[in-house]
Each structure stands twice: as structure tokens, then as C-alpha cells.
């Protein structure tokens, strides 16, 4: 989040009291929308944890999702080098655009976003009927069975690589990724946790 010093250094005069705000998906990096904040909108955003803009058409504070329920939950806020633009990393609840797309800039989603969406779907499957969902059936079978599937798919992936079968390798790697994501969800972990750990190792 913004530090007190960063807030004091924001150049509101340069932006005539309305600062451009770029909102980016905290996980996928997809640019979701552009809005404007005045000091009051920034204060409310920091207090509520939900992105709030100053609407130039309505001439009032406007919390994204206040009508639709598609809120933008704030992860972090950072100023640019000139202190006249803000970058907000957020986790969206539902589509960001009123047209139903994830981004107000159309279908610009990075391929990595699909993994996040798949992860969300797998989390929802925890409460699904095991009779109607393979994923729910996996969860119901317990951690040992899920871990066994990860092991099996790992071996099959390795075997496909040893015979240089790229088609089969792609299929087996997909199965491995799927079951690994299920195992992470089963253990209360997610891709973000793994990515952060990889970043620490890379430093």
C-alpha cells in the first residue's frame, strides 16, 4: 500500500485534483481499466480496500461494483515516478467491464489468466457434487489419492518426454498441471504462493 510519505508526495495540483489510475489484475497482470481518483476517492479506497473512483459524469465518489457487485479488491497501490499517476493491483470479483468482459480494453487477457480462472473453478468444485464432477470426486477421495494422481501423471509426463512424443507430452503435462492445481487447492495453497516462492529463490 501507499506509505504516508508517498501520499504526501502525490502531485494533485499537476492533475487538477483528478489523478489517472490504472487498475491491473494482481495475479495475471491484465490491465483491467482506467479511472480517476481525487484525494477523497483515494482515502475511501484505502479505508475500504475496494477501488473507488471519482466519477466525472456523476460528479461523485463511485465504488467500482457498488451496483453490479463486481468489486475490485485492492492488493497494492503505487505511484509512478512523477507522482501524478497511480497503479492499483487488484483482485476482481466478476467481470470488470460493464459489457461483461474481464477488461475494459476488450479481450486482451494474457494466457496466464486462464490458469487463474482454472484455479478459481477448481476452488468452487470443492463444494460440488462428487457424482457430477470429476474434480469434486477427487477432493472427496482425499489427499492421498490426489497426491497419487500427481505422481502418476508426473511419471507419464516423463515417459512421454523420453520417447520424444510432443503431442503426448503436451497432453500428459496438461493432466499433470491440472492434478497439481487440485492438490494445491486441497492443501489450502495456490499458484500465487508457488510463484512468490520461486521469486524468492531467484533473488
From Swiss-Prot:
In the N-terminal section; belongs to the PRA-CH family. In the C-terminal section; belongs to the PRA-PH family. One of its GO terms (biological process) is L-histidine biosynthetic process. Residues 1-114 are annotated as: Phosphoribosyl-AMP cyclohydrolase. Pfam families: PRA-CH, PRA-PH. Residues 115-203 are annotated as: Phosphoribosyl-ATP pyrophosphohydrolase. It comes from Escherichia coli (strain K12). Pathway: Amino-acid biosynthesis; L-histidine biosynthesis; L-histidine from 5-phospho-alpha-D-ribose 1-diphosphate: step 2/9; Amino-acid biosynthesis; L-histidine biosynthesis; L-histidine from 5-phospho-alpha-D-ribose 1-diphosphate: step 3/9. It is found in: Cytoplasm. Keywords: Amino-acid biosynthesis, ATP-binding, Cytoplasm, Histidine biosynthesis, Hydrolase, Multifunctional enzyme, Nucleotide-binding. GO terms for cellular component: cytosol. Its EC number is 3.5.4.19, 3.6.1.31. It is an enzyme of class 3 (hydrolase). It catalyses: 1-(5-phospho-beta-D-ribosyl)-ATP + H2O = 1-(5-phospho-beta-D-ribosyl)-5'-AMP + diphosphate + H(+); 1-(5-phospho-beta-D-ribosyl)-5'-AMP + H2O = 1-(5-phospho-beta-D-ribosyl)-5-[(5-phospho-beta-D-ribosylamino)methylideneamino]imidazole-4-carboxamide. This is Histidine biosynthesis bifunctional protein HisIE. GO terms for molecular function: ATP binding; phosphoribosyl-AMP cyclohydrolase activity; phosphoribosyl-ATP diphosphatase activity.
Amino acid at each position: 500500500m501507499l506509505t504516508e510519505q508517498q501520499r504526501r508526495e502525490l502531485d494533485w495540483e499537476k492533475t487538477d485534483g483528478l489523478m489517472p489510475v490504472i487498475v491491473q489484475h494482481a495475479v495475471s497482470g491484465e490491465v483491467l481499466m482506467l479511472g480517476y481518483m481525487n484525494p477523497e476517492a483515494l482515502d475511501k479506497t484505502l479505508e475500504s480496500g475496494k477501488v473507488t473512483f471519482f466519477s466525472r459524469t456523476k460528479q461523485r465518489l463511485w465504488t467500482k461494483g457498488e451496483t453490479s457487485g463486481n468489486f475490485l479488491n485492492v492488493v497494492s497501490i503505487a505511484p509512478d515516478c512523477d507522482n501524478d499517476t497511480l497503479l492499483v493491483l487488484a483482485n476482481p470479483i466478476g467481470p470488470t467491464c460493464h459489457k461483461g468482459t474481464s477488461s475494459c480494453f476488450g479481450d486482451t487477457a494474457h494466457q496466464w489468466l486462464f490458469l487463474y480462472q482454472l484455479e478459481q473453478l477448481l476452488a468452487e468444485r470443492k463444494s460440488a457434487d462428487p457424482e457430477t464432477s470429476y474434480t469434486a470426486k477427487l477432493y472427496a477421495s482425499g489427499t492421498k489419492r490426489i497426491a497419487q494422481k500427481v505422481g502418476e501423471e508426473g511419471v507419464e509426463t516423463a515417459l512421454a518426454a523420453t520417447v520424444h512424443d510432443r503431442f503426448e507430452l503436451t497432453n500428459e503435462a496438461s493432466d499433470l498441471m491440472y492434478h497439481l492445481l487440485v492438490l494445491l487447492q486441497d492443501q489450502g495453497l495456490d499458484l500465487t504462493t508457488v510463484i512468490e516462492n520461486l521469486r524468492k529463490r531467484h533473488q
